[in-house]
Amino acid sequence: EIIMGNAIKKLGWRRDTFIVSSKVYWGGEKPTQRGLSHKHILDACHAAMKRLQVDYLDLYFCHRPDPETPIEETVRAMHTLVNQGKICYWGTSEWTSEQIIKAFEIAETLNLTPPTMEQPQYNLLERFKMEKDYLPVFDKYQLGTTIWSPLGSGILSGKYIDTNPSDTRTSLKGYEFIKKKYESDSYIGVHNK
């Protein structure tokens, strides 16, 4: 975000010519620096705006559901940011359909701003959640979507078919899960089809 903010400033782009988004969940080690509490959502939004050098975010995602924070608190925090003009729209990422429905019900009951989008993982290897679980929710609430990992962390690009290139994420510490995934029977089965 710092690099992007510097680039936007250097290029002199007018604010009405681009859209920026950010996510909230991860942060520091202290309890007030992570999750979806009201405090962390507001603090993280302000920090993202500072890094991006903008006065507001167009899209702001709850990067993961937070089992330690009531959904109502999260919805209220996002509504606060919308009312303050600091975000235009808010959404979720990797929430269950039940959690999304609950957020909508809370927003409707309390006259708060509901989420407008979900960001699920969606690719040939990860289809069920989007195609079976989310579609009825998206249809009912007219929810938009952006997806993440359309190439399955690079697995579907074909570069891992016969080898594990040393200059890719699969060889990096912390990304072993990608290597396990492309060596799995389910991946091999999809690839062979």
Model-derived features with residue positions:
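Short acidic capping loops at alpha-helix termini that bridge into adjacent secondary structure
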Residues: 14-18, 22, 55-59, 88-89, ...
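Short amphipathic alpha-helices and their capping/turn segments at secondary-structure boundaries
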Residues: 1-13, 44-50, 134-142
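Active-site-proximal beta-strand/loop segments in catalytic clefts of secreted hydrolases
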Residues: 23-25, 150-151
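A short acidic, helix-capping loop that chelates divalent metal ions and anchors anionic groups
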Residues: 27-33
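Glycine-rich, proline-tolerant flexible connector loops at the mouths of alpha/beta enzymes
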Residues: 1-10, 62-72
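Beta/alpha (TIM)-barrel catalytic core signal, keyed to glycine-rich beta->alpha loops juxtaposed to Asp/Glu
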Residues: 65, 69-193
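N-terminal binding-site loop/beta-alpha segment at the start of enzyme catalytic domains
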Residues: 1-19, 55, 83, 165
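Short, acidic/polar
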Residues: 34-53, 71-76, 100-105
